[in-house]
């Protein structure tokens, strides 16, 4: 105990092995060791755990050599894997205080011998317990680092492990990618959360969607402030943003709308709703047009028709070159449920590990991969998440996914937007991943964009959106379901809005421009988030929800959600809408679906 206290005075703890060795030191040798540590502490005042490694260093090396090599050494990080911040300092003070109290009690002369022995025994046990805990944490860190290094070494050898003689046709085709910067909030965020921000946000949404509605109606809408003067008039057309939705006892739907100057009440008759002439799935904050008859009092409009700013119907986009695009999302590297074997198998497929002519043809012509968010599982996304992680360092999570993507053939261009598990703000629109993350990816042909973002990829206007608003829409619209993602995606296309309602489960940042409005007549809408694959074509727009590489989580079990992991959608960009244009790589097998 006396030896332990001498080192505690220096703010140094002894590992059990070192403690046993020091008990065999003669007094002079022990004194020299203590003096050398005391001199070293003048240059590095960190709390020291004297394990066998550092005991040998202090015994065998000159003091000047130790100071030069270890004066800036982060001992806290060496022991725990964490930087020395405020908490370790508090822990250091706490241990020092406890130690001083123990020593002071030990020096009290009137304590009875039996009590003193009992106290010493208990103190010895306490110190030993602290030592065991520190040693255990140190050993766990060493095991953890070794496991990580082994994992990284394996990932870096995926590409070279594939012996392929495929002729890479896509390698000779130039990538054509244009990012529509006006669709990406990255570097352009203006909101500070003021009332003025909210006013500008909703005004921008209203004005931009009003243009599409008036274009569809082929006429201008009346200002709502004029409706009161139009008592009894028919065929009156108005446009507004929905501020309230309610129903009457007899089943009519009451919808309040606003424009920039006034508000009005729309009455959607029950019989027209039941006949399918007008919809009943009106959402708060969406922008709609209405045609109807003004009441005799001028207080409301009886609606005959609802006009939404939906994308116009068209033929699906096709190009002349037969090349392929694959869609990923929700990879969730870092989660214990991450399907690393299946993900590795997919990367091997991309490198030419194929079993038949169809697979060889597709992989030889695959030119693009879009990733719609949640590359990693993140840290602190939900309470208790650390229990679900095999990698608790978010930088290392990104380093790992970067290493995986680096194993993909160089001629394949990769586009990445973030999701709610990624290291960006949770509120949408989300900026692209920060530089401290993107610098981990060692590829020239990788494009980082925000969420949402629209790009032109080889002639296809492609909108990437992670899909967090799906959690709100499923509860708001009867026709929308998790099991069939395209039922949700259709609702976005109808409204030209990726997240219609403010204040739901999907947080929205009130930018002065609403980046969640779908400005362009897109060719592809790519989403993720709900971990269930879905595919369809609506109004000529290819709708792809790209599933996941994460096994079913406990949360999904509680919610009754059954994911479809390790399925990768792939489209033939020359045959969209035709037989054989849509394929799925399903856990190692490529099959034509449509």
From Swiss-Prot:
Keyword terms, alphabetized: DNA replication, DNA-binding, DNA-directed DNA polymerase, Exonuclease, Hydrolase, Multifunctional enzyme, Nuclease, Nucleotidyltransferase, Transferase
The keyword Hydrolase is annotated on this UniProt entry: yes
Organism superkingdom: Archaea
Coiled-coil regions, chain positions: none
Keyword Hydrolase recorded: yes
Functional summary from the UniProt entry: Possesses two activities: a DNA synthesis (polymerase) and an exonucleolytic activity that degrades single-stranded DNA in the 3' to 5' direction. Has a template-primer preference which is characteristic of a replicative DNA polymerase.
HAMAP family recorded: DNApol_II_A_arch (MF_00325)
Annotated catalysed reactions: DNA(n) + a 2'-deoxyribonucleoside 5'-triphosphate = DNA(n+1) + diphosphate; Exonucleolytic cleavage in the 3'- to 5'-direction to yield nucleoside 5'-phosphates
One GO term describing the cellular component: DNA polymerase complex
CDD domains xref list: MPP_DNA_pol_II_small_archeal_C, PolII_SU_OBF
Name of the protein: DNA polymerase II small subunit
GO molecular function: DNA binding; DNA-directed DNA polymerase activity; single-stranded DNA 3'-5' DNA exonuclease activity
Oligomeric form and interacting partners: Heterodimer of a large subunit and a small subunit.
Enzyme nomenclature, EC number: 2.7.7.7, 3.1.11.1
Family label: Belongs to the DNA polymerase delta/II small subunit family.
GO biological process, alphabetically ordered: DNA catabolic process; DNA strand elongation involved in DNA replication
Gene giving rise to this polypeptide: polB
